[in-house]
Amino acid sequence: MQIKRLIEKIPGGMMLVPLFLGALCHTFSPGAGKYFGSFTNGMITGTVPILAVWFFCMGASIKLSATGTVLRKSGTLVVTKIAVAWVVAAIASRIIPEHGVEVGFFAGLSTLALVAAMDMTNGGLYASIMQQYGTKEEAGAFVLMSLESGPLMTMIILGTAGIASFEPHVFVGAVLPFLVGFALGNLDPELREFFSKAVQTLIPFFAFALGNTIDLTVIAQTGLLGILLGVAVIIVTGIPLIIADKLIGGGDGTAGIAASSSAGAAVATPVLIAEMVPAFKPMAPAATSLVATAVIVTSILVPILTSIWSRKVKARAAKIEILGTVK
């Protein structure tokens, strides 16, 4: 049976299918982990330790050396995305109630959900899109996008926007596995190759554990809102990313659209933030559901929109070239 190939036909399938299976488990048998105990309970409830190992391996996979073009492109996209998420957080914190919207169509929406959905780019999706529609340097710009993975950037945004406060040691704790992995991976290429293989392997495991924190009734309640959140992520982050790519990154805007997605790792952010700041715990389940839906929506729409944009840009460039030749 070609199970893996079937799962990968779904956008973000290796993340979303185990997530859904975990949610099924939690919805219909919430006490399964405690009942079975031991290793089974560890797989069901081990979101944080599994993610800690994943962050370590992610750090180890990043190469310190990169060309100036790659760093400029990557830095432009990462900084722009984070800056937009910060602005959204600052505005949302003045409009949305402290504990999120609790009634009506927007029930479940919180500043935590907005920031988690907007501050991370799906690096793998970006790289695959730009390999088709961009240059090698543009495709390689995903190198710094890995720095967005994990709760650190979300913590910085929430902290600097005055929405939450984190002790310095909490910041260190959040980024330490990543930094240790990064150091080891760059000190020894063989270690980088060894640990980087686990990045993709661990995704289904932390996704399943994460799914076991989600009640499917919450997803049913936030489904349409999650779709709208996904569209909002593309519009709100995509426009500034296109502008930044043109003005600073030296591109034609294609990379900007390709970077306007939500990363699969963002689904874990609400739960991780809630572990550090208990005040966010009531919002975490709904925020996780919203972000998961946004990940699906952006994974489907971003490649389509990038393709349309790229064709129009190339057609315009060809037309200008023809006119220039005629003159």
From Swiss-Prot:
Localization annotation: Cell inner membrane
Main localization (coarse): membrane
Residues that span the membrane, as ranges: 10-30, 42-62, 73-93, 95-115, 139-159, 163-183, 199-219, 224-244, 254-274, 289-309
Record's bilayer topology term: Multi-pass membrane protein
Name of a matching Pfam family: KdgT
UniProt entry tagged with the keyword Transferase: no
Recorded GO CC terms: plasma membrane
Any one GO molecular function term: 2-keto-3-deoxygluconate:proton symporter activity
Keywords: Cell inner membrane, Cell membrane, Membrane, Sugar transport, Symport, Transmembrane, Transmembrane helix, Transport
Disulfide bonds: none
Catalyses which reaction(s): 2-dehydro-3-deoxy-D-gluconate(in) + H(+)(in) = 2-dehydro-3-deoxy-D-gluconate(out) + H(+)(out)
Domain of life of the organism encoding this protein: Bacteria
Annotated function: Catalyzes the proton-dependent uptake of 2-keto-3-deoxygluconate (KDG) into the cell.
HAMAP family: KdgT
NCBIfam families: kdgT
Family membership noted in the UniProt record: Belongs to the KdgT transporter family.
Name of the protein: 2-keto-3-deoxygluconate permease
Gene, per the UniProt record: kdgT
